[in-house]
């Protein structure tokens, strides 16, 4: 990105236009294991993505235990923009540092939020464990890792 493009990105009106076009969609998924409350896990998802329409699907685990998979997609721009604005309130230095390993070659950004913290209305990004999985499709043309990373870093800076 050249100096002029960066100046344009940082100007207020262009910044909001840019942010509005930043994300194509957000796919989410969480597993509800035996002993967990489906209502609590659904609420945890809604605390991160308030407009989510959650679908439930039953599955069977490795030990033949019952698992419910909660999933869905957020595509409306006002909702993806609201999510990204809230994400900017988190530790953007850490998010920025993790971009290389959390974005795939097609421009998908993978984040995981703690289910327990999300239920308590706290956004905690984690690398493993019991979590809400997000797959965020960054609007990068062409859809490549480097372009997606550059777009996100412009907003972080």
Q: Residue locations for each model-derived region?
A:
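Short amphipathic alpha-helices in soluble, non-transmembrane regions
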Residues: 41-44, 83-90, 150-153
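A common structural junction motif
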Residues: 48-53, 90-94, 129-133, 155-157
């Amino acid at each position: 990105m050249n100096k002029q493009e960066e100046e344009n990105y940082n100007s207020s009106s262009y910044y909001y236009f840019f942010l509005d076009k930043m994300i194509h969609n957000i796919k989410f998924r969480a597993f509800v294991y035996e002993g967990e409350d489906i209502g609590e896990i659904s609420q945890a998802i809604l605390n991160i993505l308030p407009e989510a329409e959650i679908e439930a699907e039953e599955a069977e685990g490795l030990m033949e235990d019952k698992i419910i998979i909660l999933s869905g997609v957020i595509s409306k721009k006002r909702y993806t923009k609201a999510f990204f604005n809230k994400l900017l309130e988190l530790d953007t230095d850490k998010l920025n540092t993790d971009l290389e390993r959390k974005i795939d070659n097609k421009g998908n950004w993978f984040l995981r939020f703690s289910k327990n913290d999300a239920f308590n209305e706290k956004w905690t990004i984690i690398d493993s464990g019991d979590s809400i999985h997000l797959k965020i499709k960054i609007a990068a043309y062409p859809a490549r890792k480097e372009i997606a990373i550059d777009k996100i870093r412009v907003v972080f800076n």
